[in-house]
């Protein structure tokens, strides 16, 4: 039987159906396909809806999506992963994601240790490949929570069962290190660096006190194989080398500052031949370190790897006397078709460079407002930079600090570093080296590697009492806030 529905009711029913579909959002399968097409797609709203309904797989994916964003709250991600794990009855791989988060966020390690210890007892580690690899991931972050004999057994099972994308090298390295077999561990770490980007920082840490000398030497040996390495690994190596060079530069600046202060008020004498030779040797070493960074980064840029392109563009913008506006703009133009949003952020920074004739405060502000309206995570930092540099008028450090603090409260680790630099190099009331050290340590402990150079510089210039006060303030921040 056919029912003739009046057009008005038909339109109303269609509108209701469309509204219901809109309210329902995407399914988990649709979200995964969206992320497959565009890893930076905005899907958190749909995932939150699914997670609120108790979908544990969506809860896990939401945590993973947030983990890729710089402004996400570590506390929220921890809660999502623990909810998805559901005491071992839910998504066991959530434990692996949580372990990776803790590995990137050092201050979480001790706080989460009791929970992780209990979680390991809530599922059989050798039940299937998924459980086995999850326990091995926890072993990477907490080697002491898995007995070496069990880790060796699980590693053997992993190697037997794994068919695709098998990467046992890092597990072997950590196991050998745990058992005190350092020569074997180093051999495995060197192999792991070639296949697993996470091994890069771990090998650097493994090298101990001489890491800033030994790791660059290792990368020089690796250069003949560089073209065959995964592009992510090349970029991570470049980023670590850049951090090492930044620390080297900061230590030289601190030495120069100390030397100037020690002769303040005294008759300024010309440098001795020994001083000139030492300064030349330091500058030559820094030039070599900078060239090494550029060689590695340029390979990743040539492959069209967006994070490397963004990193190089940021370097050019931060060093406008060494680069020109034309070559920087050309690089931003290459980023645009690959990642329009990040290109827009770079373009805003580009218009804030006062060394170039292309400086345009109005265009910079308009782009920042577009980014803020779209919910871009770094928009608040860009606006803070706009005020701290005084792009439109005189620098407004208080307004910049307020914006950076707001971003830090949201969980943006880079914001702590921005506050640290403003207190370290700012003028008048904003100049506060103790606060600078406090915030730089917070940033570093939250995983912001770029803060290491500022920490090292301040450690060489601040009195011991000031460092102790700064560390007490840092500890207080971690107790008071959910960082």
Model-derived features: where do they sit?
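Residue-level detector of the short coil/turn that links helix A to helix B
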Residues: 38, 70-72, 106-107, 180, ...
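Alpha-helical adaptor scaffolds
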Residues: 140, 349-355, 369, 376-414
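Hydrophobic face of amphipathic alpha-helices that form TPR/SEL1-like repeat modules
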Residues: 30, 61-68, 95-105, 135-142, ...
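Terminal, low-structured helical/coil segments at or just beyond the last alpha-helical repeat
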Residues: 269-270, 450-483
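N-terminal leader/linker segments that initiate helical-solenoid repeat arrays
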Residues: 16-68, 133-134, 212, 231-233, ...
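Short helix-capping/linker turns of helical repeat alpha-solenoids
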Residues: 53-55, 69, 87-91, 122-131, ...
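Bacterial N-terminal signal peptides that target proteins for export
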Residues: 2-10
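Alpha-helical repeat scaffolds
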Residues: 42-48, 74-85, 109-124, 148-162, ...
